[in-house]
UniProtKB/Swiss-Prot annotation:
GO terms for cellular component: cytoplasm. Catalyzes the formation of a hydroxyacyl-CoA by addition of water on enoyl-CoA. Also exhibits 3-hydroxyacyl-CoA epimerase and 3-hydroxyacyl-CoA dehydrogenase activities. This is Fatty acid oxidation complex subunit alpha. Pathway: Lipid metabolism; fatty acid beta-oxidation. Heterotetramer of two alpha chains (FadJ) and two beta chains (FadI). It comes from the Bacteria.
Length: 715
């Protein structure tokens, strides 16, 4: 047996070489530049052994094949030429694997992503496990890049151009059965026989070539290709609004390879990779990736977490049902739901059933796995089954006396160590804990709706919350698959506080006569997933505006909204999508059509709806207020760092990730430019735009939020 630090070569008695991949000291296999020499040494031994019948690449890790290339390698590149060279080195290594004279099989279990999939594509065949952990994809676009080790050229030839474009442009990950159907893998087997199945495949002298479906063959021809690429360019431009240069380059590179041959395609891929690596968009997206990775490792406090074996939930409504699902089905923890009536419990159980049944229908999980996960959730109209719960999450109405009553009941009916976590979005945690016998075990845990989709949670300790309570709550959030940030117990916390002025300004422009669709389109063009008016419709106009009075009472007039407008809309029974009446028209459920503004909205608020501002002016008015408030939160230590502020905004409200978050964006603009812009807007629109003291100080001292010690690199 010959060993290297990350790759182990073992030639079996049946003359099949098994190359086991195991990056030492790491939970996950990633490809690093220094591994190239190790792989080449193994490939040399394989070429020299004339008795070999085949080769199998397999991971020695428990639940991943190769999760991608080490992104830190890109950060070490000083210019586009160095990044291009990095890509060419990867291409050359993959070409050497593909050129081996015997069948080469990739045996895949777990994540096979980015450079890992490019390596698998260089193998002659791929076989994977039917495990839920097994996913295959090329997610480089999410970092503002494209696959740089041959992925843009091999994937279209393997699965067809339309499937490849869809995978590479979106970064989507395919599960085992989806990969088999697409032709990405040749077989799907149980994990227990993965190696033997791969060895048997490697022994076959002739590996039959897969024929592409008729549709893909037509699209690969000159006429079909021209039509497809024209359509894809148009759709991609609509989706990205020109904010993500990687998508355009991906299309160009794939088209070059198909039209001019793979040699030209590989050359175009390497050049595009080098250029994209130096773009501000890729640098920002990589910064978000590293920041989110750091946040996920952050324990929240220096204290060790307490026990976390079971959870209780008070309230079986929309939020309670969603929290139950992420706790049981993602966290694997037993959940007991208490509601005042059985209808609430049934609603919460159905919520989880519907989500799990969708997974079964899509073949993501099997029916027995659905039943196993659902069995973790139970309910009661009293506190039976709560005595041993380690943490109880309260998800009842936003009513302070009611929440204080919940604290008292939990302290009476649960264990002495039980933590009480409130899902409040607006009430101070200190007030909720005011009458608590054990205030050190009361904390805020603010989820965003819909719970199963939104990745962020805010963990909110009040003045008396213990360090262990913080650590335990952060641990739970991570188990639930969430990205937690710890924020201070101040009105609006962080996310809602920076979102409110953004929404307020959109409503104010509406009262000035700007059209709904013009306001929303301007912010989508800026980079938000949806505009502020549509966002209000989606979360519920009543829900989205109820925090405004709380913020106005705490921080003054800068949070005041055109109250008569909001009241007029709510008095007209307009709550948004949830009751089919909002700023937009809602047709029959299930029908997909372009969103149309309800023309009655203009009459309701007494304007004609004629836009006068440019899209840039609309976006500037909304975004600058959000940035100014984020800077205040930094100054007041509502957030612990610029990192947390960026992650909170990107994951909590969809702040454009290609800008890196509000603090990286402010650093890019420069504090001097921020202050000058805010002063200009204040002169035009009033004192709500006055730059906060933090920005003025930073402009004077030429400081930045992200200090020089905080790099874009991962640790």
């Amino acid at each position: 047996m010959t060993t290297t630090s990350a790759f182990m070569l073992n030639v079996r008695l049946d003359n099949v070489a098994v190359v086991a991949i195991d990056v030492p000291g790491e939970k996950v296999n990633t490809l690093k530049a220094e591994f190239a020499a190790q792989v080449r040494a193994i490939l040399k031994q394989i070429r020299e052994n004339k008795a070999l019948q085949g080769v199998v690449f397999i991971s020695a890790k428990a639940d991943n094949f190769i999760a991608g290339a080490d992104i830190n390698m890109i950060g070490h590149c000083q210019n586009a030429q160095e990044a291009e060279t990095l890509a060419r080195q990867g291409q050359q290594l993959m070409a050497e694997i593909q050129a081996l004279p015997v069948p080469v099989i990739a045996a895949i279990h777990g994540a096979c992503l980015g450079g890992g999939l490019e390596m698998a594509l260089a193998c002659h065949r791929r076989i994977c496990t039917d495990d839920v952990k097994t996913v295959l994809g090329l997610p480089e676009v999410q970092l503002g890049l494209l696959p740089g080790s041959g992925g843009t050229q091999r994937l279209p030839r393997l699965v067809g151009v339309s499937t490849a474009l869809d995978m590479i442009l979106t970064g989507k990950q395919l599960r085992a059965r989806q990969a088999l159907k697409a032709g990405l893998v040749d077989d799907v087997v149980p994990q227990t026989i993965l190696l033997e199945a791969a060895v048997e495949l490697a022994k076959k002298e002739r590996l039959a070539q897969r024929t592409l479906p008729v549709r893909e063959r037509i699209l690969a021809g000159p006429l079909g290709r021209a039509l497809l690429f024209r359509l894809v360019r148009k759709k991609t431009a609509q989706k990205t609004q020109g904010n993500y240069p990687a998508t355009e380059r991906i299309i160009d590179v794939i088209e070059t390879g198909l039209a001019q041959g793979s040699s030209s395609g590989y050359d175009a891929e390497a050049r595009a990779f080098g250029e994209l690596a130096m773009t501000p968009q890729s640098q920002a997206l990589r910064a978000v990736f590293f920041a989110s990775t750091e946040v996920k490792k952050d324990p929240g406090s220096d204290a060790p977490p307490g026990p976390l074996n079971s959870v209780g939930i008070l309230g079986g409504g929309l939020m309670g049902g969603g929290i139950a699902w992420v706790t049981a089905c993602k966290g694997g923890l037993p959940v007991r739901i208490k509601d005042i009536n059985t209808q609430g419990i049934n609603h919460a159980l159905k919520y989880s059933w519907d989500l799990l049944e969708t997974k079964v229908r899509r073949r993501h999980i099997k029916a027995n796995e659905r039943d196993k996960q659902l069995a973790l959730i139970s309910g009661s109209t009293d506190y039976r089954g709560f005595s041993h719960r380690d943490l109880v999450i309260e998800a009842v109405f936003e009513d302070l006396p009611l929440k204080q009553q919940m604290v008292a009941e939990v302290e009476q009916n649960c264990a002495a160590h039980t933590i009480f976590a409130s899902n409040t979005s607006s009430l101070p945690i200190g007030d909720i804990a005011a009458n608590a016998a054990r205030p050190e075990q009361v904390i805020g845990l603010h989820f965003f709706s819909p719970v199963e989709k939104m990745p962020l949670v805010e963990v909110i300790p009040h003045a008396s919350t213990s360090a262990q309570t913080i650590a335990t709550t952060v641990k739970l959030a991570k188990k639930q698959g969430k990205t937690p940030i710890v924020v201070s117990d101040k009105a609006g916390f962080y996310v809602n506080r920076i979102l409110a002025p953004y929404i307020n300004e959109a409503i104010r422009m509406l009262t000035e006569g700007e059209r709904v669709e013009h306001i929303d389109a301007a912010l989508v063009k800026f980079g938000f997933p949806v505009g502020p008016i549509q966002l209000l419709d989606e979360v519920g106009i009543d829900t989205g505006t109820k925090i405004i009075p709380v913020l106005e009472a705490a921080y003054g007039e800068r949070f005041s909204a055109p109250a008569n407008v909001v009241a007029s809309i709510l008095n007209d029974d307009r709550k948004g999508r949830k009751n089919g009446r909002g700023f937009y028209l809602y047709g029959e459920k299930g029908r997909k059509s372009k969103k149309q503004v309800d023309p009655a909205i203009y009459k309701l608020i007494g304007v004609q709806g004629q836009s006068r501002l440019s899209a840039q002016q609309v976006a500037e008015r909304c975004v600058m207020l959000m940035l100014n408030e984020a800077a205040r939160c930094f100054d007041e230590k509502v957030i612990r760092s610029a990192r947390d502020g960026d992650i909170g905004a990107v994951f909590g409200i969809g702040f454009p990730p290609f800008l890196g978050g509000p603090f990286r964006y402010m650093d890019a603009l420069g504090p001097g430019e921020m202050v000058a812009t805010l002063q200009r807007l204040a002169a035009l629109y009033g004192p709500r735009y006055a730059p906060c003291e933090q920005l003025v100080r930073m402009a004077e001292r030429r400081e930045h939020f992200w200090t020089n010690g905080e790099t874009d690199q991962g640790n």
